[in-house]
Design a protein with these regions (language model features):
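Alpha/beta-hydrolase fold catalytic core
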Residues: 2-46, 69-71, 112
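Flexible "cap/lid" subdomain of the alpha/beta-hydrolase fold that forms the substrate-access gate
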Residues: 18-23, 46, 74, 81-117, ...
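Generic low-polarity alpha-helical segments
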Residues: 1, 12, 38, 52, ...
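Residue-level signal for well-ordered alpha-helical scaffold segments within enzymatic catalytic domains
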Residues: 4, 39, 62-69, 104-108, ...
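Conserved HGGG/HGGXW glycine-rich cap/lid loop of the alpha/beta-hydrolase fold
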Residues: 34, 40-85
C-alpha cells in the first residue's frame, strides 16, 4: 500500500483534476481559536496533505483526485495561507502551533491518526508531527525536505545547501518580504489555469 500510495503521489503531475473545486467539500477546524481551512474528497483511510510555500490546499488537487477512490484526502491551508486565519505576530507561527493545526483537522474529522504528507515547508510540519505524535502518524511521506537532523547538518556544513537555502533567510528581511505579492508568487505556477487561483 505504501509503495502504491507513494507512486500515485509522485506520478500525479499531469492535470487530472479538472474542476476539483466542485467535487471537494470545504470545512474549518478550530485550532485554539485559529480557523484552519481544509478541503476533502473521497473515503477510506485518512491522508492529510500539508502544502509548502507559497502554496495552499489547491496545490494537492491532482494527488487528491488520483487517490480519492481509495482514501479520504484532506488538504489543508496552513495558518497564514488562503482561507485559514492569519494571526499577527511571528510567535503565532511556531512549528508546534502548526503541528497543532494538523491535529485539529484530524480531530475535526473524528479521526485519531492519519497518513501525513508534506511538501517543502509542509514537510517540516509533517516531520515535526511524526516526531512529536507518532501515535497519530499512520505513515509519513515527505517531499523536498530531508529529516530535520540531516537538514541541520547540511545547513551547518554544506556550502551548497547554505547557498540553496539562502532564499528563506532573505524572506526574513522586511524589504524582501514586502515585495512578495500574490501576483509575483503566482508566476511560479506554470499552469495558467491554476495560476489564477493563486491570486
Amino acid at each position: 500500500m505504501v509503495r502504491t500510495l507513494l507512486l500515485l503521489i509522485l506520478l500525479s503531475t499531469t492535470t487530472l483534476a479538472g474542476d476539483i473545486e466542485s467535487k471537494v467539500k470545504h470545512a474549518y477546524a478550530n485550532s485554539n481559536g485559529v480557523k484552519i481551512h481544509y478541503a476533502t474528497i473521497g473515503s477510506g483511510p485518512l491522508i492529510v496533505m500539508i502544502h509548502g510555500f507559497p502554496d495552499f490546499w489547491y496545490t494537492w488537487r491532482d494527488q487528491m483526485e488520483a487517490l480519492s477512490d481509495k482514501f479520504q484526502c484532506v488538504a489543508i491551508d496552513q495558518r497564514g495561507y488562503n482561507l485559514s486565519d492569519k494571526p499577527k505576530g511571528v510567535e503565532n507561527y511556531d512549528v508546534r502551533l502548526l503541528v497543532g493545526d494538523v491535529v485539529a483537522v484530524i480531530k475535526s474529522l473524528g479521526q485519531e491518526k492519519a497518513i501525513i504528507v508534506g511538501h517543502d515547508w509542509g514537510g517540516l510540519v509533517a516531520w515535526q508531527f511524526a516526531l512529536n505524535l507518532p501515535q497519530m502518524t499512520d505513515r509519513l511521506i515527505v517531499l523536498n525536505l530531508p529529516h530535520p537532523r540531516g537538514l541541520t547538518r547540511e545547513l551547518a556544513h554544506n556550502p551548497d545547501q547554505q547557498k540553496n537555502s539562502q532564499y528563506a533567510r532573505n524572506f526574513q528581511q522586511a524589504e524582501v518580504a514586502s515585495k512578495l505579492t500574490p501576483e509575483g508568487l503566482a508566476r511560479w505556477v506554470k499552469d495558467p489555469a491554476a495560476r489564477e487561483k493563486y491570486i
